């Protein structure tokens, strides 16, 4: 599959139309490792056979050179790269930027030819040093958030010079060319301010359109995170806030459909309703909903946290006009995607000949299979099946996708039993890890009063001094 990314023109288009060239791009966030308990996620949790491309988010920048951000990025890079040993067709990319990164470092870097050359040279060295197959630009956004208007053109220049440098380096070394992709805006004003679409499309291998965050608690009323279509009562600029409009805007303004990758969110936005009895789309809200126990961000729940909300008695509803679900309980309300909406969107993707799907993020899907009772990675597996990627030959038999465990890692690991084992142990106990009296390799994981029995990896025991798995 991955070799198809090097094809251009008619051959690529024909393959895409035959359904054999769809890409399934999955982002991994390097801060997911810090989530507590069952939410902690590292590259070892990734099923290497799940996605065609994995993107490590994020790298940083200093003095116009690419840099690491987290203290253990280099170690995580190695684990990320090891996934290719299980799937020889897998491509791994490194994303630079992100929302929290801001725009100032990009603006300073693109401002002069010398700075751009410094950056690109550092990128080539960095990607090869750590085994990446390409770079993903995540500048949010050119021409916006303090980025001057000239950055719209300079972003095109940067991408062009990056692509040309990658091509030249490939010729000189006789190695495969490094890929260059970008995560781009779905909001019309940001698109118009930031991207020269026809020119940019010439140089990018793929364009990852962030078709999510269309609505959230910042608006003062309920709305879906990633609706496929507009809501019947939408007027004015709200009619643009949907997947259909955003993707067609990119396509109609010069981006080839086969290069356009539709964004799929493995999360939702939650709200506090002003009136519990007024709980539909567009209902007045008083702010962001409570933070989830794992992602710990107000107004934001991972898919697995939403499943816990549903299990806790929330009412799930389906919005036929936008082909997405929402759920509510009391004054809490969340708009999100599930396996049904992913399947419908994937069908729409194929009918419109787009290049594939991008998921933010792999660590937000129910990767343990604990919360949703739909197996592991239910959302991404839905896309994999819908895009016809199930038959890809890949051996992940020895790959762990359970919660992390290593000496000093508080999240624990190993095979998790159902919550019925040790039922009642966590009643009245604070969230945390506790020893199992008759088994040094096992421990109880208490999460919101629910009891989970887990095991450390072979050779490790539960250490009460650090409440972690440690060497015996």
From Swiss-Prot:
S-S bridge residues = 26-51, 49-394, 307-372, 456-469
Boundaries of each Chitin-binding type-2 domain copy?
423-472
Extract the InterPro entries matched here.
Chitin-bd_dom (IPR002557), Chitin-bd_dom_sf (IPR036508), Chitinase_II/V-like_cat (IPR011583), Chitinase_insertion_sf (IPR029070), Glyco_hydro18_cat (IPR001223), Glyco_hydro_18_chit_AS (IPR001579), Glycoside_hydrolase_SF (IPR017853), Glycosyl_Hydrlase_18 (IPR050314)
Q: Write out the ranges of the annotated region (Disordered).
A: 397-421
Extract one GO cellular component term from the record. cytoplasm
UniProt keywords (A-Z) are:
Apoptosis, Carbohydrate metabolism, Chitin degradation, Chitin-binding, Cytoplasm, Disulfide bond, Glycoprotein, Glycosidase, Hydrolase, Immunity, Inflammatory response, Polysaccharide degradation, Secreted, Signal
What does the function comment of this entry state? Degrades chitin and chitotriose. May participate in the defense against nematodes, fungi and other pathogens. Plays a role in T-helper cell type 2 (Th2) immune response. Contributes to the response to IL-13 and inflammation in response to IL-13. Stimulates chemokine production by pulmonary epithelial cells. Protects lung epithelial cells against apoptosis and promotes phosphorylation of AKT1. Its function in the inflammatory response and in protecting cells against apoptosis is inhibited by allosamidin, suggesting that the function of this protein depends on carbohydrate binding.
**Entry's family note:** Belongs to the glycosyl hydrolase 18 family. Chitinase class II subfamily.
The record's subunit annotation is: Interacts with EGFR.
Name assigned to this protein:
Acidic mammalian chitinase
Look up and give the organism this protein is from: Bos taurus (Bovine)
Underlying gene:
CHIA
């Amino acid at each position: 599959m991955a070799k198809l990314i090097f094809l251009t023109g008619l051959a690529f288009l024909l393959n895409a139309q035959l359904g054999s060239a769809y890409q399934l791009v999955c982002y991994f966030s390097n801060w997911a490792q810090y989530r507590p308990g069952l939410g902690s996620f590292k590259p070892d949790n990734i099923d290497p056979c799940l996605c065609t491309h994995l993107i490590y988010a994020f790298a940083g920048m200093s003095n116009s050179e690419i840099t690491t951000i987290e203290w253990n990025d280099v170690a995580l890079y190695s684990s990320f790269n090891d996934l290719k040993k299980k799937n020889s067709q897998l491509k791994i990319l490194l994303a630079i930027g992100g929302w929290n990164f801001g725009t100032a470092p990009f603006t300073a870097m693109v401002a002069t030819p010398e700075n751009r050359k410094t950056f690109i040279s550092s990128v080539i060295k960095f990607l090869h040093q750590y085994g990446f197959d390409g770079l993903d630009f995540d500048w949010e956004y050119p021409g916006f958030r303090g980025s001057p208007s000239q950055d719209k053109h300079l972003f095109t220049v940067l991408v062009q010079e990056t692509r040309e440098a990658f091509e030249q380096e490939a010729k000189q070394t006789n190695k495969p060319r490094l890929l260059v992709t970008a995560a781009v805006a779905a909001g019309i004003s940001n698109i118009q301010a930031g991207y020269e679409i026809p020119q940019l499309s010439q140089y990018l291998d793929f364009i990852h359109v962030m078709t999510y965050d269309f609505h959230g608690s910042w608006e003062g009323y309920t709305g879906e995170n990633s609706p496929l279509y507009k809501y019947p009562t939408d007027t004015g600029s709200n009619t643009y806030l949907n997947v259909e409009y955003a993707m067609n805007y990119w396509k109609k303004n010069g981006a080839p459909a086969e290069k356009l990758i539709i964004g799929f969110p493995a999360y939702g936005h939650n709200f506090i309703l002003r009136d519990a009895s007024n709980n539909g789309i567009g209902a007045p809200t008083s702010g962001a909903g409570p933070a989830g126990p794992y992602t710990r961000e107000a107004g934001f729940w991972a898919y697995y946290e939403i499943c816990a909300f549903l299990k806790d008695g929330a009412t799930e509803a389906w919005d036929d006009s936008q082909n997405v679900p929402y759920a509510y309980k009391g004054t809490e309300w969340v708009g999100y995607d599930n396996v049904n909406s992913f399947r419908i969107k994937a069908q729409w993707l194929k009918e419109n000949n787009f290049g594939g799907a991008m998921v933010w993020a792999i660590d937000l899907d129910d990767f343990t299979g604990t919360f949703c009772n739909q197996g592991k990675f239910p959302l991404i597996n839905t896309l994999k099946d819908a895009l016809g990627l199930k038959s890809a030959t890949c051996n992940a038999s020895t790959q762990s996708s359970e919660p992390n465990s290593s000496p000093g890692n508080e999240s624990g690991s190993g095979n998790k039993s159902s919550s019925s084992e040790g039922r009642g142990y966590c009643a009245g106990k604070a969230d945390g890890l506790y020893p199992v009296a008759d088994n040094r390799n096992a421990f109880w994981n208490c999460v919101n009063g629910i009891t989970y029995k887990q095991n450390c990896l072979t050779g490790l025991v539960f250490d009460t001094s650090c409440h972690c798995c440690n060497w015996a």
